[in-house]
A protein has these predicted regions:
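Alpha-helical membrane-inserting segments
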Residues: 17-29, 52-60, 93-108, 196-200, ...
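Alpha-helical transmembrane segments of multi-pass integral membrane proteins
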Residues: 10-14, 18, 41-49, 54, ...
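Short, Lys/Arg-rich, polar N-terminal cytosolic tail immediately upstream
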Residues: 1-3
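Juxtamembrane helix-loop-helix connectors linking adjacent transmembrane helices
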Residues: 29, 33-41, 70-144, 155-158, ...
């Protein structure tokens, strides 16, 4: 079986098993009469599912050829200022990509589905207590998502070269979220985090960045007044990101590959049954998220 097909098949099966696991936990928690609303329980179960994704996927792909990140990373030091710079790039890029996505979704929902453009993320975390978001969304999910996509999966793709591994792992990370609202900016996040891992050789820095991003998006942003303050904040992010990328793109991002890498046949790899099934799942999930 082709490697991408096998990886996508493993992702799909892992997501299915993790959904069953979180569903069982959801039912159990629902019968215990806990002082939590349904949405809070769903967020908790979502974090449990992210743990399951990692362990199931690692089990199903343990025999796939891989290259250890530490063997080919640049092993550069990573300072607090580097982290702040990457976070600004991530927030600035996300601001732009989210704006583009909102325009697309507004058109699709209004003219094709005749529904209001209510955010998937807003529905998911809205009215959930901050402590639950902190534990589940800011701590647990980033740890296991980064271990899955920027450690296990990235190493399995590295035989094709760093650039190919970054792009494909990031695309699968975007599809993993199974909705159009998060698709573009999660791909961008994947690219940024994968670059950090391959430059430093340390997954923990990508985890810290992911945590900081989720902390801002899930908790801190809720305390920023809407209107001109939001526009000012987003403008600062975009301008800062543009300046950092212009000044440091060549040293802080991997933009070319080594010569001695395995040839990647896009046509053959993306025509495998595993990738096709994963794509079908993603399309159905996106349509469902838009329609409902």
């Amino acid at each position: 079986m082709k490697k991408i097909s096998r990886i996508c098949g493993a992702l799909l099966i892992s997501m299915l098993l993790s959904s069953i696991l979180s569903g069982v936990v959801l039912v159990i928690m629902g019968t215990l009469n806990l002082p939590l609303d349904v949405q809070s329980i769903k967020v908790i179960c979502g974090s449990i599912a992210s743990v399951g994704y990692f362990y199931f996927f690692r089990f199903f792909t343990k025999e796939i050829e891989k290259i250890d990140i530490n063997e080919i990373s640049l092993n550069k030091k990573f300072s607090v200022w580097d982290g702040i710079g990457y976070l600004l790039v991530l927030l600035g890029g996300t601001t732009i990509l989210s704006g583009i996505t909102d325009i697309i979704l507004e058109f699709i929902k209004r003219y094709l589905f005749h529904t209001e453009n209510v955010g998937v993320v807003e529905n998911y975390i809205g009215n959930v207590p901050a402590w639950i978001l902190l534990v589940c969304v800011v701590i647990i999910s980033p740890v296991f998502e980064e271990l899955l996509f920027r450690k296990v999966l990235l190493e399995e793709l590295l035989p094709y070269g760093k650039v190919t591994a970054i792009l494909i792992s990031s695309m699968l990370f975007g599809m993993f979220h199974a909705n159009l609202e998060q698709f573009l900016y999660t791909i961008f996040m994947g690219i940024v985090c994968a670059n950090i891992v391959l430059i430093t050789g340390k997954v923990r820095y990508a985890i810290y960045l992911h945590m900081a991003f989720n902390l801002f998006g899930a908790i801190i942003s809720g305390y920023i007044p809407s209107g001109r303050y939001t526009i000012l904040t987003e403008s600062i992010f975009v301008i800062s990101a543009a300046i950092i990328v212009i000044l440091k793109a060549k040293t802080e991002f991997i933009i070319k590959d080594e010569a001695n890498v395995n040839k990647f046949n896009f046509k053959k790899e993306f025509c495998g049954i595993g990738f096709i099934m994963f794509m079908v799942y993603w399309i159905i999930s996106c349509v469902g998220a838009i329609a409902y």
